[in-house]
């Protein structure tokens, strides 16, 4: 995955210059001379001059203030209705008839399939262009004491990639949203040795980033089973690994969660970020919420990053003074419960020559975690009651995100590679034509996961009921589907 990401990054950099000069595809890839020049300028005042000239003393500047206005959408709709009514009144009967005829012609055009000759012009891969063999896995199971380490040996250009996972599948259901909060505060509060801004500088100096997240890993053959992990990710040069791991220890063990002022700031920032994320990814929010009605994996994701999570964050933001003591106590207890050696698993991407040094740093971290308060041979998932709610949520947007979800494994079916093909066909055929082209939505998606979880969702959709009716028509549309070599043959 890392190698593929690097290749994609290089490809995109090539396009940045190649688009404008056929003879310069590698301009932004061949960057060593540029970095060498920049390093030479560190002590010369070069960067300070740039900041002074182009930022501090730049005469070209703008200040933009955006203020909310209650009822603005209603005013805009009223203005539009008046404008359209005035336009209609200005038309003659013949012009109205022509407008109706043009609209019918447009709908007919949208419903007509593209000619095969036009579709044949689209470049396509042939069967012989694709490998039948799966990409090789570079997984070697190792041990550091009693801790499992999965080593992915591959060329990494001198960079070590570590994912440090803590098994929290036994976390109580009521505590799940607080796990979501914990991942946002680690690395953003004062620690024993650093203020939060100094900590950010140290992270930037010694690493390519330290981040926290929650990982949900459904069981492929058992939809009701899964693993739930708290994950810490570190990317750093091999030579900087000791400093990086010491920073990680500092964050895990000495974060000052009891700093009420900073915690209040983070909660307020978090609320704003989640709201902004919802505005841009309503399709993900809708599909996750729909899946959470019956899928434990989706329920956990929703509780730590979805609407349920947002509701807790908003409540804490509005009533911080009343709830701060309980929040701090909850987070401090959670830190001591999660970060113990018995829960830890490590995934490492590095070259073989660097592995021993990595293992030594893993051992260092293990020695500096909290001691276990109890010995548990096998952690189990808590009891969870799932409920189909069929909800709708309103916001200030003028568009909608309409989702339907289900699980085909629970209905006796099993995963098959053909579902990958169905996803493409449906995304560019039935859903594309009906939801996007005819319905006016900006996009439409569908997904079929290995554990059976499935969803359809529209993106920036002006319709609700109409889109839901389109989902109803999916079974009929594909009952008699015949497989052909290309989509143009369908």
Protein language model regions, located:
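Single conserved hydrophobic/aromatic residue that forms the stacking wall/gate
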Residues: 2-6, 480-483, 487-490
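His/Glu-based metal-binding/catalytic segments typifying zinc-dependent metallopeptidases
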Residues: 10-24, 28, 90-187, 336, ...
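Histidine-acidic residue clusters that define the catalytic metal-binding segment
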Residues: 17-46, 136-141, 290-343
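Extended, domain-scale alpha-helical bundle/helix-rich regions
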Residues: 53-58, 62
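Terminal amphipathic helices with adjacent charged low-complexity linkers/tails
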Residues: 68-73
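A glycine-rich, aromatic-flanked flexible loop/lid motif
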Residues: 153-156, 217-222, 389-404, 433-453, ...
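M16/MPP (pitrilysin/insulinase) zinc-metallopeptidase core fold and M16-derived inactive scaffolds
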Residues: 171-246, 425-434, 438, 447-448
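C-terminal catalytic or substrate-handling cores of phosphate/nucleotide-
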Residues: 238-254, 258-303
């Amino acid at each position: 995955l890392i190698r593929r990401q690097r290749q994609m990054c290089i490809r995109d950099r090539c396009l940045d210059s190649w688009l404008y000069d056929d003879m310069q595809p590698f301009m932004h890839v061949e960057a060593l001379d540029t970095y060498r020049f920049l390093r030479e300028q560190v002590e010369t005042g070069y960067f300070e001059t740039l900041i002074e000239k182009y930022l501090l003393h730049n005469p070209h500047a703008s200040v933009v203030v955006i203020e909310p206005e209650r009822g603005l959408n209603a005013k805009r709709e009223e203005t539009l209705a008046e404008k359209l009514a005035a336009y209609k009144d200005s038309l003659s009967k013949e012009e109205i008839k022509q407008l109706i005829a043009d609209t019918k012609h447009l709908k007919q055009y949208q419903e007509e399939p593209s000619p095969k000759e036009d579709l044949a012009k689209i470049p396509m891969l042939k069967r012989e262009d694709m490998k039948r063999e799966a990409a090789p896995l570079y997984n070697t199971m190792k041990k550091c004491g009693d801790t499992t380490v999965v080593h992915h040996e591959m060329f990494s250009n001198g960079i070590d990639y570590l994912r440090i996972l803590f098994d929290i599948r036994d976390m109580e259901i009521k505590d799940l949203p607080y796990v979501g909060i914990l991942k946002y505060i680690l690395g953003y509060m004062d620690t024993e040795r650093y203020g939060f801004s100094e900590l950010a500088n140290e992270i930037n100096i010694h690493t390519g980033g330290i981040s926290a997240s929650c990982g949900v890993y459904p069981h492929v053959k058992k939809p009701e089973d899964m693993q739930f992990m708290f994950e810490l990710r570190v990317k750093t040069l091999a030579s900087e690994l000791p400093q990086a791991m010491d920073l990680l220890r500092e964050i895990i063990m000495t974060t000052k969660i009891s700093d009420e002022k900073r915690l209040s700031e983070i909660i307020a920032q978090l609320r704003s970020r989640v709201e902004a994320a919802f505005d841009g990814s309503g399709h993900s929010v809708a599909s996750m919420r729909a899946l959470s009605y019956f899928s434990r994996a989706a329920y956990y994701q929703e509780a730590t990053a979805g609407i349920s999570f947002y509701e807790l964050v908003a409540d804490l933001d509005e009533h911080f003074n009343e709830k701060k003591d309980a929040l701090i106590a909850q987070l401090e207890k959670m830190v001591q419960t999660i970060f113990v050696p018995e829960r830890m698993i490590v995934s490492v991407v590095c070259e073989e020559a660097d592995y021993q040094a990595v293992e030594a740093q893993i051992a260092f971290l293990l020695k500096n975690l909290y001691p276990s308060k109890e010995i548990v041979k096998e952690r189990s998932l808590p009891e969870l009651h799932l409920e189909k709610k069929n909800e709708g949520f309103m916001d200030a947007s003028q568009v909608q995100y309409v989702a339907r979800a289900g699980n085909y494994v629970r209905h006796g079916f099993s995963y098959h590679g053909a579902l990958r093909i169905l996803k493409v066909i449906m995304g560019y055929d039935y859903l594309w034509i009906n939801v996007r082209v005819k319905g006016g939505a900006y996009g439409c998606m569908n997904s079929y996961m290995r554990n059976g979880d499935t969803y359809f969702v529209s993106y920036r959709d002006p319709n609700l009921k109409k889109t839901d009716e389109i989902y109803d028509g999916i079974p009929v549309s594909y009952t008699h589907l015949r497989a052909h070599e290309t989509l143009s043959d369908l």
